[in-house]
């Protein structure tokens, strides 16, 4: 199945969270938490401005991003993969390595 986000929405595949602490302790349950880092797999065409023009997004497919999973974030299971639908404003940073 293909999903094409609309407007300023971004489809993100969450990265796996590290299940060991820096000291080597295995984390379980709520201590492990959910990662707020992921890879952009699809982007919308952009945000529609008040004057009707479309401003393209700053993120692109393949970018690794850090995001805030706010109240507007939606989780969808697509082809047995959990993906997040976020607005670009939910993305806090692009990770450059």
From Swiss-Prot:
It holds the Pfam family Cpn10. One of its GO terms (molecular function) is unfolded protein binding. It is found in: Cytoplasm. One of its GO terms (cellular component) is cytoplasm. The keyword Cytoplasm applies. Keywords: Chaperone, Cytoplasm. The keyword Repressor does not apply. PROSITE patterns: CHAPERONINS_CPN10. Its main location: cytoplasm. GO terms for biological process: chaperone cofactor-dependent protein refolding. Together with the chaperonin GroEL, plays an essential role in assisting protein folding. The GroEL-GroES system forms a nano-cage that allows encapsulation of the non-native substrate proteins and provides a physical environment optimized to promote and accelerate protein folding. GroES binds to the apical surface of the GroEL ring, thereby capping the opening of the GroEL channel. Belongs to the GroES chaperonin family. Heptamer of 7 subunits arranged in a ring. Interacts with the chaperonin GroEL. This is Co-chaperonin GroES. The lineage of its organism: Bacteria, Pseudomonadati, Pseudomonadota, Gammaproteobacteria, Enterobacterales. The gene is groES.
